Every structure is written in C-alpha cells, then in structure tokens.
Regions:
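Interfacial loop at the N-terminal end of multi-pass membrane proteins
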Residues: 3-61, 108-120
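Core segments of transmembrane alpha-helices
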Residues: 55-69, 129-138
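Transmembrane helix-loop-helix
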Residues: 68-90, 146
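Mid-bilayer segments of alpha-helical transmembrane spans in multi-pass integral membrane proteins
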Residues: 90-98
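Interfacial loop-to-transmembrane junctions
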Residues: 102-132
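Juxtamembrane boundary at the C-terminal end of a transmembrane helix
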Residues: 141-150
C-alpha cells in the first residue's frame, strides 16, 4: 500500500510540475522582455526568490519520490519504468545545475537590462526542459493507470 500512495503523490507532483513548466515557458519567460532595463536586476532577483517554494520545492519532492520508487515499486510496474523515471529526473537536475540555472543567473546584461542573446538561448533551450518534465508526468500518469488497473 505505501507504494501506491507514493505513486499517487508522485503523480500529483509531476502533474503540478508539468503545468508549472508550461506556464513558465509560455507566459513568464516571454514577459521578461517587457521589464525595463533599470528594473530588470531587481525584478529578476525577486523572481528568483519567489520560485523556491512554488517551483524548486515541488521539483525536489518529485525527484525524491522518483528515487524512492526504486525501493517502493508499485505493483504491476516494471522496474525499467522506474529507472526511466529516475533517468528523466536526473537529466532534469543535471540540466538545471549545469545549463539552465547558470544561464538564468547570467541573464542580466552589463547595461542592467536583459541580455537579448542569453534570453533567446534560454527561450530556445528551455523547450528541452519542458519536454523532460512533460515526459515524466506522462510516464507517471501511465504508471498510475497501470498500477490501478485502468
């Protein structure tokens, strides 16, 4: 029974993450170009502080739940599916630590506004992050349906 609860909790976290990453990609990031050069540094710093609870904490819980499923594998779920999920979470964490996090930290231009080249790079490469988060949510959704016999 604990494995089914873990799977359901992971489904909630994964669905939340998928909704959040699409909102960021389609709404939040595109709006950054409208922030004035004089205000961008303060805006970006406030944005960074604001995402810890609503973005980073749920993402961390999703990653931890993914790893916990190695030991608490739900019935009817093949171990390779668990490992695919762990791989997707690892790719997301490594990509964030190595690429997207540092890129976001350097979005401010020397002049104080948004660096247009880095901003375009973020908008273009962030689609990979959207794909990873979405793929994980779909995988967990399929696993939940399988575990519940749907």
């Amino acid at each position: 029974m604990p494995s089914e609860w873990l799977l359901l909790a992971t489904l909630v976290f994964a669905a939340y993450g998928a909704g959040q990453v699409w909102l960021v990609q389609l709404s939040s990031y595109p709006l950054w170009r409208f922030v004035g050069a004089d205000e961008f540094r303060a805006y970006h710093a406030a944005w960074w502080r604001s995402i810890w609870g609503v973005v980073l904490a749920p993402a961390g819980l999703t990653a931890m739940a993914s790893v916990l499923m190695i030991w608490l594998r739900p019935p009817r779920i093949a171990s390779f599916e668990i490992w695919v999920g762990v791989g997707l979470q690892a790719a997301l964490l490594v990509g964030t630590a190595v690429w997207w996090g540092p890129l976001m930290a350097r979005l401010g231009a020397q002049t104080g506004g948004l660096d247009p080249k880095r901003y375009r790079t973020l908008l273009g490469t962030h689609w990979l992050r959207v794909a990873i988060v979405t793929a994980y949510a779909l995988l967990i959704g399929r696993m939940t349906a399988e575990a519940l016999g749907l």
